[in-house]
From Swiss-Prot:
Gene: rplQ
Organism: Pelobacter propionicus (strain DSM 2379 / NBRC 103807 / OttBd1)
Keywords for the protein's UniProt record, in alphabetical order: Ribonucleoprotein, Ribosomal protein
Coiled-coil positions: none
Protein name per the record: Large ribosomal subunit protein bL17
PANTHER family in the cross-refs: LARGE RIBOSOMAL SUBUNIT PROTEIN BL17M, RIBOSOMAL PROTEIN L17
One cellular component (GO) term of this entry: cytosolic large ribosomal subunit
Length: 127
């Protein structure tokens, strides 16, 4: 039974899923915004927020843990030098997920996951 088992499998084996999360988090920090499916965005949110928390700690051990997860050294440097200091006063909630509709082809629900910089003001809805 599946009781109390957290996380989505996303139709992939464990190693494939973990590699995908590493790639997506690396891209998120490199570009500060990526478009992906809702389920993937919800899963990488927790991983990305843990990496930013490591960046806020800023010690050598945190740097090594982040470097073991993030695939590019330049992105690790960016995380510790520019991204983490941006959230020094914020206690969590470093990412935002915005739903953008469905993908052409398979109608998968798509989202944009981005790093929070300032307050989000949604567009006025046409009622």
């Amino acid at each position: 039974m599946r009781h109390l088992k957290s996380g989505r499998r996303l139709g992939r084996k464990t190693s494939h899923r973990e590699a995908m999360f590493r790639n997506m988090v690396t891209s998120l920090f490199a570009h500060e915004k990526i478009t992906t499916t809702d389920a993937k965005a919800k899963e990488i949110r927790s991983v990305a927020e843990k990496m930013i928390t490591l960046g806020k700690r800023g010690d050598l051990h945190s740097t090594r843990i982040a470097a073991a997860f993030i695939r590019e050294k330049s992105v690790v440097t960016k995380l510790f030098s520019t991204i983490a200091p941006r959230y020094k006063e914020r206690a969590g909630g470093y990412t935002r997920i915005i739903k953008v509709g469905s993908r052409n082809g398979d109608a998968a629900p798509m989202s944009i996951i981005e790093l929070v910089e300032e307050e989000f003001t949604p567009k006025a809805s046409r009622a």
